[in-house]
C-alpha cells in the first residue's frame, strides 16, 4: 500500500543520511591527515610511501593475505561502518559474485578516493582501500579514453597534439600530491615543453613526418603510475 511504501521510505532515509554523514566525517579526517603528511614528506618520500601503501592493496602482497583481508571488519559496533566494509569486500570479489555489487565509494572525487587509498590510520579496511583504488582506476580509464579520442581528432584536423598535452598537464596538476609523486620528476616540465613547441607531427620533416600519434600518446601514458588492481 501507499502508506506502507511511505513508511519503508521513512525507515531507510535515516540510515542513508547516517551513512553519508559518517563517510563525510571520515573523509574530512582523512583529508586532514593527508594534508599533514604532504607537508612533512619530500616528493621522493611521498612517492615511496605511496608505493608501499599500494602494495598493501594490490599485487602479490595483497593476494597473500586475501583471506585475512576478506574477513577484516572495522573495530566498531557502528552498523553503517560494518555494512560498508562488507559491501567493499563483496565488491572487490565481484568477479565471483555475478558482478552485481556496488562500489561503496563510487562517485567520490579523485582526491577523496586518494585520501581513502593512502590512509594508513586504520580508519578503512584493506578491502575498502582497494575498492576506493578500483574506483579511482575506473575514473582514470574513463578520462584516458576521452582524452585519447580528443587527441586523435586534434591530430587528424591539425597534425598536432598540443591541446592533448595541455589536457594531460591540467589533469596531472589536479591530482593529489601523493599521486603526482608517482610520476617522473620532470613529467610536468616535459609536457610544458611539448606545449610550448606546438609541434606539427605531420609536416615537420626533422621529427617524424606522418608519425603515428598513438605511439606518442601511449609513450606518455607509460610514464604514469600503472593501475594497481588485477582483473
Residues of each region from the PLM?
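Type III/flagellar secretion export determinants
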Residues: 1-231
Amino acid at each position: 500500500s501507499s502508506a506502507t511504501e511511505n513508511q519503508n521510505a521513512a525507515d531507510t532515509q535515516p540510515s542513508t543520511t547516517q551513512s553519508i554523514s559518517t563517510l563525510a566525517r571520515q573523509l574530512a579526517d582523512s583529508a586532514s591527515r593527508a594534508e599533514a603528511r604532504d607537508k612533512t614528506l619530500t616528493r621522493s618520500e611521498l612517492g615511496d610511501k605511496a608505493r608501499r601503501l599500494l602494495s598493501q592493496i594490490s599485487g602479490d602482497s595483497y593476494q597473500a593475505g586475501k583471506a585475512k583481508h576478506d574477513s577484516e571488519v572495522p573495530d566498531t559496533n557502528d552498523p553503517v561502518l560494518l555494512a560498508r566494509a562488507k559491501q567493499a569486500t563483496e565488491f572487490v570479489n565481484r568477479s565471483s559474485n555475478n558482478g552485481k555489487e556496488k562500489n561503496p565509494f563510487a562517485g567520490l572525487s579523485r582526491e577523496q578516493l586518494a585520501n581513502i587509498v593512502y590512509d594508513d590510520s586504520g580508519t578503512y579496511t584493506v578491502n575498502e582501500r582497494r575498492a576506493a583504488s578500483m574506483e579511482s582506476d575506473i575514473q582514470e580509464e574513463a578520462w584516458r579514453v576521452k582524452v585519447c579520442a580528443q587527441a586523435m581528432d586534434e591530430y587528424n584536423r591539425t597534425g598536432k597534439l598540443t591541446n592533448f598535452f595541455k589536457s594531460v598537464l591540467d589533469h596531472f596538476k589536479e591530482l593529489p600530491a601523493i599521486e603526482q609523486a608517482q610520476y617522473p620528476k620532470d613529467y610536468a616540465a616535459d609536457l610544458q615543453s611539448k606545449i610550448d613547441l606546438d609541434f606539427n607531427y605531420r609536416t615537420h620533416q626533422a621529427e617524424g613526418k606522418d608519425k603515428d600519434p598513438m605511439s606518442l600518446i601511449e609513450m606518455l601514458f607509460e610514464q604514469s603510475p600503472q593501475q594497481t588492481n588485477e582483473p
